[in-house]
């Protein structure tokens, strides 16, 4: 019998799970700084714990834990944790003396290196009180198998408020909690026959609903149920692909047209990444730094250059990478390349599963002039968008491709990659990940405290020892720089260069700081 409390992980979600090793935990998070209300004398940790307890039903996926398939022969499922207790996930922590921002960053970096407990829902939150200037901090981490950047923003809307004194949120009733556990038993065979019949009755129009052929599952985690459910999925997936074939063919046709353009081969050749000191085997240690830049200054640069905020983020990242590699005498002659994630999430979609693809953009680190770098990045980013945009409609189909029997192989490959030191030998596919996620223009509050900064904390892996992720929040861009501790032990040095690089770009474009 299928239940609404069981959900199979997508291919993308499962990839994050099976790629995880001791050196490469696959969770993302944030270091959030909050300003406590004037005259506050309460216990912020207790207030936050109460808020999570009252609102956890608004984000039900936070109560799901993993149910692995027997022998890992198929993707695991999310099942509701019947023993869920919020106190196992929201905990108090203390920043040691001198309790400043640098100490907090080092502590969050150390905590980010620790993997999540797979026996429980894959998220944790730590509350740091006792910071100077009437501030507190919240470090959160959540497995990337559960969430992407777009879903993270949606989750924020549920847990955060737009005023310090919000109206009460809906409270979960016992009836509502019990209703999700009950579902009428359906005849699997007849449902499959009905789906086949529906396929031939349905006109094959662009954008057919992916759920039109959603067949029931047994929902069991025993070997027999997993095999049956995998067989059902192997029938369901081709039905969905067939129903969406016009859109798929249109996407492939657009991609082929772009690939046949005269400059396409030149564009692909420019995406080859050089080997650098950042593209090596990593340890489990992490180094983290958060830096804030003025959104107004970045937008002024975007307007002056004819680009967007994301283009300026790439130019700033390019500049600090060039500065850092020059400082350690390790700048390659060829330009570094960046992988830029792109959300495939439709507007209003708040599902927590990953819906993302991406593009590769050369960063022009071989150019000394900041303006020339910016212009090159603008041209390369536009070219890369043109190449990858036709693939956006394919993401939902690829995320559900049948994978029976492959998870175990994927895990073995991940283990081999770590133990063989292959990242020190093979050329990197890309040099760095640079991600820019819009967070919110309006201020957010949590348990009455105002969020002042939300510094993202992402993932580094073998061969990719540095990650730059940015949140646009209110009137600032909050940069989160995550690095492997054995490669960049003091990533705050790179963070400090961001301000200098912003000034250099402003000077190059004749903008007064």
Give each language-model segment a name.
Residues 1-12, 31-44, 49-464, 468-499, ...:
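Soluble acyl-CoA-dependent acyltransferase catalytic core bearing the H(X)4D motif
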Residues 19-24, 422-425:
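Short secondary-structure boundary/capping segments within folded domains
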């Amino acid at each position: 019998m299928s239940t609404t409390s069981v959900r199979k992980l997508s291919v993308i979600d499962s990839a994050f799970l099976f790629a995880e090793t001791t050196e490469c935990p696959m969770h993302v998070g944030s270091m959030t700084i909050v300003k406590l209300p004037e005259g506050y004398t309460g216990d912020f940790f207790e207030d936050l714990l109460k808020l999570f307890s009252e609102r956890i039903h608004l984000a039900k996926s936070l109560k799901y834990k993993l149910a692995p398939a027997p022998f890992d022969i198929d993707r695991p499922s999310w099942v509701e944790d019947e023993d869920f207790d919020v106190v196992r996930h929201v905990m108090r922590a203390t920043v040691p003396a001198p309790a400043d921002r640098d100490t907090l960053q080092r502590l969050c970096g150390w905590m980010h290196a620790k993997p999540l407990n797979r026996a429980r829902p894959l998220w944790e939150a730590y509350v740091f009180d006792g910071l100077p200037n009437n501030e507190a901090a919240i470090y959160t981490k959540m497995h990337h198998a559960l969430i992407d950047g777009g879903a993270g923003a949606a989750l924020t809307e549920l847990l955060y408020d737009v005023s310090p004194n919000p109206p009460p949120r809906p409270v979960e009733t016992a009836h509502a909690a019990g209703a999700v556990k009950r579902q009428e038993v359906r005849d699997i065979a007849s449902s499959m026959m009905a789906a086949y019949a529906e396929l031939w009755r349905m006109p094959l129009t662009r954008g057919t609903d992916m759920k039109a052929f959603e067949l029931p599952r047994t929902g069991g985690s025993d070997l027999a149920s997993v095999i049956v459910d995998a067989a059902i999925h192997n029938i369901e997936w081709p039905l969905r692909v067939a129903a969406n074939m016009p859109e798929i063919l249109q996407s492939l046709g657009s991609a082929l047209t772009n690939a046949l353009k005269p400059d396409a081969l030149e564009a692909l050749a420019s995406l080859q990444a050089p080997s650098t000191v950042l593209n090596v085997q990593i340890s489990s240690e992490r180094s983290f730094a958060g830096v804030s830049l003025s959104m107004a200054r970045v937008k002024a640069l975007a307007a002056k250059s004819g680009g967007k905020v994301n283009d300026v983020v790439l130019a700033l990242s390019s500049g600090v990478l060039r500065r850092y590699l020059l400082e350690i005498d390790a700048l390659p002659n060829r330009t570094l390349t960046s992988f830029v994630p792109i959300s495939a999430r439709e507007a209003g979609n708040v599902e927590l599963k990953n819906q993302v693809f991406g593009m590769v953009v050369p960063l022009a680190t071989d150019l000394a002039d900041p303006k020339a770098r910016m212009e090159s990045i603008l041209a390369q980013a536009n070219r890369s968008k043109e190449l990858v945009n036709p693939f956006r409609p394919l993401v939902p189909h690829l995320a559900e491709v049948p994978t029976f029997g492959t998870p175990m192989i994927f895990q073995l490959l991940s283990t081999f990659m770590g133990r063989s030191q292959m990242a020190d030998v093979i050329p990197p596919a890309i040099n760095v990940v640079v991600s820019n996620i819009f967070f919110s223009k309006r201020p957010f509050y949590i348990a009455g405290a105002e969020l002042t900064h939300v510094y993202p904390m992402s993932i580094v892996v073998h061969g990719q020892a540095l990650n730059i992720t940015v949140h646009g929040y209110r009137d600032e861009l909050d940069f989160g720089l995550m690095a492997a501790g054995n490669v960049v032990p003091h990533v705050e040095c790179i963070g400090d260069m961001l301000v200098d690089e912003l000034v250099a770009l402003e000077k190059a474009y004749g903008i007064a700081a």
